[in-house]
Amino acid sequence: MVVREYNEEMKYIERLSPNSFLIKKGFQSNMNVEGIFYANSRLEKLMFDELRNACRPGMTGGFLPGVKQIANVAALPGIVGRSVGLPDIHSGYGFAIGNMAAFDMSDPTSIVSPGGVGFDINCGVRLLRTNLFEKDVQPVKEQLAQSLFDHIPVGVGSKGIIPMNAHDLEEALEMGMDWSLREGYVWAEDKEHCEEYGRMLNADPSKVSLRAKKRGLPQLGTLGAGNHYAEIQVVEEIYDKYAASKMGIEELGQICVMIHSGSRGFGHQVATDALVEMEKAMKRDKIETNDRQLACARINSPEGQNYLKAMSAAANFAWVNRSSMTFLTRQAFAKQFNTTPDDLDMHVIYDVSHNVAKMEEHMVNGRPKQLLVHRKGSTRAFPPHHPLIPVDYQLTGQPVLVGGSMGTCSFVLTGTETGMVETFGSTCHGAGRSLSRAKSRRNLDYKDVLRDLEEKGISIRVASPKLVQEEAPDSYKDVRDVVQTCHDVGISNKAIKLRPIAVIKG
């Protein structure tokens, strides 16, 4: 690994625009393409401070700085375009979280890397709208928060309440939301408003280890811990009236529910299993990477194909999981307001993944190419008229759901043509950490965090209060900076801002 002083490092980084920076070849060894990252003045300071700290003598351990990780990904075989760092980027395993990279499927050397998807495969966000307003919910907010907390199993070891045996799990892994529909947990229209219609067709449960299945079986329909949550939110601002109305959001004060969850221990095990296999494949195929954490396999190798099939099964698990929680959320609201979910107009606006690798067609040097697009902490953001987005959103572009940190605002964005060209149809996914979990535990007190939420008028139900400081707003970048940066560089447009009034957490 190249070790240089900070001033030397900065010679390889060039400002392209007020909010974008080019990472030139040579910043890390063997770069096949350049890197780029997007950041406004506040976010760029975090990026460069991280790099400066890493240049100090004796600084070892932990993950590499985000800029280095972007450059190491740029050195992977078969990468096309640029290795992209989005404004919410922070260091992660192999790839930074908030890193997008696309690989040419016609190139026999191209790879797939579990580190480019993440351990929580198809961690993603679903947004439901309602016909309720803040004035309807405010008087019963505490009861409603409790009702949600009672209905949705949360926390690290939480067990699901959706009846599930081993045979059901096999079917769910293969069918995704089609299983949820057959079993009566979702409405038929929910699938239409879901990335991939809630089902990755190349899923193959036989490529998933027994251990992963054992971990996943009791966890279906559970929220999990970490940064996962269910939030009752209020529409606070509408930036794009036309796009909002297409999503069924007509007025300020309207109530929505956001569910942020993934594939739980199941996806984690799939990733862990794949990394072991890929280390062997790298030796056999003589694949060299700059960082051991970037374990990978040729896309067309048995290990590469097995991982993609198992990853797709984990993605289906996550969609079934969010669908089960949608069912439980609808039940909780219906019970509280003594009516039906239908009468409350509890429709799914959209469901997006922000940890996945997918085969997509994109233009590269003016020609269409099949690419394997890795999005880790990055959301698909396809433009208007794209064939893969629902009929309802053909004129607006795909909705993009960006969850803020706990107690801060969330946003709905829409995809753009610029994003299609610049980032292969990708944008940010959230606020992005500015403090590691360990630092958050050392520097913040969970009681202060809970008090702060109460002062903001946010009801909170949390399974593990002592984990709360890891997710405190002070542990994260400001999601407003992240979303505005994406808007300013044109890779997504702001449509709606949502403010939380109740949070359910693991």
Curated annotation (Swiss-Prot):
UniProt entry keywords in alphabetical sequence: GTP-binding, Ligase, Manganese, Metal-binding, Nucleotide-binding, tRNA processing
Record's cofactor remark: Binds 2 manganese ions per subunit.
PROSITE patterns (alphabetical): UPF0027
Any single biological process term in GO: tRNA splicing, via endonucleolytic cleavage and ligation
Active site: 429 (gmp-histidine intermediate)
Binding, GMP: 227-231, 354-355, 403-406, 410, 429-432, 505
Domain of life according to the entry: Eukaryota
Protein name: RNA-splicing ligase RtcB homolog
Annotated organism of origin: Anopheles gambiae (African malaria mosquito)
